[in-house]
UniProtKB/Swiss-Prot annotation:
Binding locations of (S)-2,3,4,5-tetrahydrodipicolinate: 156, 165-166
Record-given protein name: 4-hydroxy-tetrahydrodipicolinate reductase
Function according to Swiss-Prot or TrEMBL: Catalyzes the conversion of 4-hydroxy-tetrahydrodipicolinate (HTPA) to tetrahydrodipicolinate.
Protein's pathway: Amino-acid biosynthesis; L-lysine biosynthesis via DAP pathway; (S)-tetrahydrodipicolinate from L-aspartate: step 4/4
Record's catalysed reaction(s): (S)-2,3,4,5-tetrahydrodipicolinate + NAD(+) + H2O = (2S,4S)-4-hydroxy-2,3,4,5-tetrahydrodipicolinate + NADH + H(+); (S)-2,3,4,5-tetrahydrodipicolinate + NADP(+) + H2O = (2S,4S)-4-hydroxy-2,3,4,5-tetrahydrodipicolinate + NADPH + H(+)
Cellular component GO terms held in the UniProt record: cytosol
UniProt record similarity statement: Belongs to the DapB family.
SUPFAM superfamilies, A to Z: Glyceraldehyde-3-phosphate dehydrogenase-like, C-terminal domain, NAD(P)-binding Rossmann-fold domains
Chain's gene name: dapB
Length: 267
């Protein structure tokens, strides 16, 4: 059995991850961690996820459960994830990282840690989203510079980073396929007298409202026709199942920084 720990286990995504782990053959939740000031520390992780008691109590410190897991799943905050990354690197633990909002410099720290431990880092662990990335690469290469490209994403009102990590990853895939640098061509929102659109740019539009789990559309607009590639998530479980799938895939892997394209063999 693959021994899995979940960081941020008392949160919405954490509870969904606990459920996904317990539903997956070959995986087992052996540790659950949340922030030290959580009033739920000491509670049974299974009861937090409405599964009934499973005998795993919520801890407030990763170090206290260091001997109880093989791989840590972390969907928290960059500052928290980086601390956990240092811990896992020191103790030889694999990691699944679904945290978004990293800076370029922070992503480099993930790559450095990948020299010592196996890591799967992805902006989105949904199988559908990762298939969409493959389709986006194909579409961009075929359509080339003859289209205007816009990325529209929507998430729930509690999401703190924008654009979403998935939207940015979609932009990177499209830009790379076209030989462009996303940092140079990205346009984040428009207002006022913007002038005519530069064909080389890739636009981003962000919506934050209600309980939207995650909607992403990439628009390729040409003269006379439009191609839209859209993915809509209706449940966090799709991300959680992908993360657990990645955790099982990492078993026996050499150190390295992998992503879901590797897990799904889409390269």
């Amino acid at each position: 059995m693959r021994r899995i720990a979940v960081m941020g286990a008392a949160g919405r995504m954490g509870k969904t991850l606990i459920e996904a782990v317990q539903q997956t053959p070959g995986a087992g939740l052996t540790a659950a961690i949340d922030r030290p000031d959580s009033s739920l520390v000491g509670a049974d992780a299974g009861e937090l996820a409405a599964l009934g008691r499973i005998g795993v109590l919520l801890s407030d410190d990763l170090a206290k459960v260091a001997d109880e897991f093989d791989v840590l799943i972390d969907f928290t905050h960059p500052s928290v994830t980086l601390k956990n990354l240092a811990f896992c690197r020191k103790h030889g633990k694999a990691m699944i990282i679904g945290t978004t909002g990293f800076t370029v410099e922070e992503k480099q720290l993930l790559a450095e840690a990948g020299k010592d431990i196996p890591i799967v880092f992805a902006a989105n662990f949904s199988v559908g989203v990762n298939l969409s990335l493959k389709l986006l690469d194909m579409a961009a290469r075929v359509l080339g510079d003859d289209v205007d490209i816009e990325i529209i994403e929507a998430h729930h009102r509690h999401k703190v980073d924008a654009p979403s990590g998935t939207a940015l990853r979609m932009g990177e895939v499209v830009a790379n396929a076209l030989g462009r640098d996303l940092q140079e061509v990205a346009v984040y929102g428009r207002e006022g007298q913007t002038g005519a659109r530069d064909r080389k740019t890739i636009g981003f539009a962000t919506v934050r409202a209600g309980d939207v789990v995650g909607d992403h559309t990439v628009l390729f607009a040409a003269e006379g026709e439009r191609l839209e590639i859209t993915h809509k998530a209706s449940s966090r479980m799709t991300f959680a199942k992908g993360a657990v799938r990645a955790a099982l895939w990492l078993d026996g892997r050499e150190p390295g920084l992998y992503d879901m394209q590797d897990v799904l063999e889409l390269r």
